[in-house]
């Protein structure tokens, strides 16, 4: 049942923090309870979307079973509604709306009936050409029932590409045809009668990775068979007891079914790949790996680089100063800053991780508490100390301003803010809710004006050069991170992604305004 109550704490958070659109998960394993595995996979991806979620399964009789709902994964699903989700494969989704309203009708998976059976789809990202593609389809007489990009994708996949036999599914050709029309930004999983396809756009803008698990054979439990999973982040692979294989490559189509796994190039990968750098800064869980490196380690390097670029003021010493981070995503950067600067790291804030999605409306008194319901200072650690407060980003500055007031109220004598990313100057149009130009404080004010607004003694950001150095230094080519042949060719194929001249292979448009593809908004 959809709950339309507004949440004041969630609204407060949305005013201050960028939001990832979605998390996707898929598994093919007829021997297992795939809906239950998908459930735990989605729990691991909960941080990527908290508005709605859903699971769909395909059974041996070619029937699709689906359950969606508004709220967190463990609020929507239980033993009763998981039990009917029988099947040999499953796809799942956690959603935060950046294209389409936050309503149950826009929850995923989306199921569509085609001439070749039902298909289900889950997607992360925004189509940068959604407007023109929607218009093109409507001119052909196609109607739309929801305002999410995923319906555009399903309609394109339902249409038979020119030159293909309309009596055959040709899913690989259909997907490649869709990819030819949509450069970015998407990572999606498509469930068909013939298995699951994982698809990543040619820029690699949204993450998608591949894992495997060994399961007992149905006919002979003493033997095992390898099955496969696809997911937005590797943390979900570990959660279900699977083994990480590799990232899905830009432009790649990965097909998992009864016969195992095959791989195709759906669209030639770009010479300038553009994985969203905010995956490293904020979105991904610290225990996930991308491009062969652990997110936690990258964030710690960001903190170390930040300390070299913007060291503590000379008035601060390791006797009277502490480094604290804003829980949770900023803690690795704070640890790195402390390590490099020699100023001790201390826990200064605790976070209530369970209140931001409550639908219980607060009294006027509690509403006035604002940020205090989400964060609480450790007064004994802070009182009488100079504080270096490390956060991962400033978007609108509402949260950081409130936290500074909270920390000062706990007895801090000085507060120096250090941000482990550059100023956010431009909105994102590729799957992240990052406000508009009018709402971005970095676009409208100087660093000094922001410092004055938030009430800090000093404010300094990590440079773009420092950010990219922290990210790029640990990237491992696919050939180093995995030697498993997953391509349809007879020998293993590796694709070394080209790095352009300034060694920048990530989307940094929110910092520079240089978008990696054309937009038709």
Swiss-Prot record:
Binding site for [4Fe-4S] cluster: 276, 428, 507, 510
CDD domains: GPATase_N (cd00715), PRTases_typeI (cd06223)
EC number(s) per entry: 2.4.2.14
GO CC entries: cytoplasm
GO biological process entries: 'de novo' IMP biosynthetic process; purine nucleobase biosynthetic process; purine nucleotide biosynthetic process
Residue ranges of coiled coil: none
Active site per database record: 22 (nucleophile)
Catalytic activity annotation: 5-phospho-beta-D-ribosylamine + L-glutamate + diphosphate = 5-phospho-alpha-D-ribose 1-diphosphate + L-glutamine + H2O
Domain Glutamine amidotransferase type-2, first and last residues per copy: 22-259
Cofactor annotation remark: Binds 1 Mg(2+) ion per subunit.
Required co-factors: Mg(2+); [4Fe-4S] cluster
Record-level Gene Ontology MF annotations: 4 iron, 4 sulfur cluster binding; amidophosphoribosyltransferase activity; metal ion binding
Key words, A-Z: 4Fe-4S, Allosteric enzyme, Glutamine amidotransferase, Glycosyltransferase, Iron, Iron-sulfur, Magnesium, Metal-binding, Purine biosynthesis, Transferase
SUPFAM superfamilies: N-terminal nucleophile aminohydrolases (Ntn hydrolases), PRTase-like
InterPro entries cross-referenced by the UniProt entry: GATase_2_dom, Ntn_hydrolases_N, PRibTrfase_dom, PRTase-like, PurF, PurF_N
Protein name: Amidophosphoribosyltransferase
Organism of derivation: Dictyostelium discoideum (Social amoeba)
Designated gene of the protein: purF
């Amino acid at each position: 049942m959809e709950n339309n109550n507004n949440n004041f704490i969630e609204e407060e958070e949305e005013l201050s923090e960028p939001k990832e659109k979605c998390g996707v998960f898929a598994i093919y394993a007829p021997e297992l309870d795939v809906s239950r595995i998908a459930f735990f996979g989605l729990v691991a991806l909960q941080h990527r979307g908290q508005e709605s979620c859903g699971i769909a399964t395909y059974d041996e009789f070619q029937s699709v079973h689906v359950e969606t709902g508004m709220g967190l994964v463990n609020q929507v699903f239980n033993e009763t509604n998981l039990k009917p989700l029988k099947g040999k494969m499953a796809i799942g989704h956690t959603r935060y709306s950046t294209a389409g309203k936050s309503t149950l009708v826009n929850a995923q998976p989306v199921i569509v009936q085609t001439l070749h059976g039902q298909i289900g789809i889950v997607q992360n990202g925004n189509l940068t050409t959604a407007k023109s593609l929607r218009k093109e389809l409507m001119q052909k007489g196609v109607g739309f029932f929801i305002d999410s990009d995923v319906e555009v994708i399903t309609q394109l996949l339902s249409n038979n590409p020119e030159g293909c036999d309309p009596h055959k599914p040709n899913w690989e050709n259909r997907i490649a045809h869709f990819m030819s029309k949509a450069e970015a930004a998407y990572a999606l999983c498509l469930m068909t009668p013939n298995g699951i396809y994982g698809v990543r756009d040619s820029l690699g803008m949204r993450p998608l990775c591949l894992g495997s698990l060994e399961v007992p054979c149905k006919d002979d439990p003493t033997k095992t068979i390898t099955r496969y999973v696809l997911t937005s982040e590797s943390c979900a692979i570990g959660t279900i007891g699977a083994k990480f294989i590799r990232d899905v490559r830009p432009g790649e189509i990965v097909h998992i079914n009864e016969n195992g796994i095959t791989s195709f190039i759906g669209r030639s990968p770009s010479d300038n790949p553009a994985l969203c750098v905010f995956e490293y800064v904020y979105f991904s869980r610290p225990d996930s790996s991308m491009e062969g490196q652990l997110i936690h380690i990258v964030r710690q390097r960001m903190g170390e680089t930040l300390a070299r670029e913007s060291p503590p003021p000379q008035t601060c010493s390791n006797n009277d100063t502490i480094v604290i981070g804003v829980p949770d995503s900023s803690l690795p950067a704070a640890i790195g800053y402390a390590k490099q600067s020699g100023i001790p790291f201390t826990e200064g804030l605790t976070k209530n991780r369970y209140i931001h999605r409550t639908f219980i409306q607060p009294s006027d008194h509690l509403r006035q508490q604002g940020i205090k319901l989400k964060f609480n200072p450790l007064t004994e650690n802070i009182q009488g100390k100079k504080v270096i407060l490390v956060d991962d980003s400033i978007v609108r500055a509402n949260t950081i301003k409130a936290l500074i007031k909270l920390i000062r109220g706990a007895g801090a004598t000085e507060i120096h803010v250090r941000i482990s990313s550059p100023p956010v100057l431009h909105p994102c149009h590729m799957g992240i809710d990052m406000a508009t130009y009018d709402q971005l404080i970095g676009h409208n004010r100087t660093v000094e004006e922001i410092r004055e607004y938030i009430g800090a003694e000093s404010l300094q950001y990590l440079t773009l050069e420092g950010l990219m150095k922290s990210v790029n230094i640990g990237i491992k080519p696919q050939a180093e991170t995995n030697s498993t042949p997953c391509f349809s060719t007879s020998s293993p194929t590796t694709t070394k992604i080209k790095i352009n001249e300034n060694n920048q292979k990530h989307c940094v448009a929110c910092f520079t305004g240089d978008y990696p593809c054309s937009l038709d908004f």
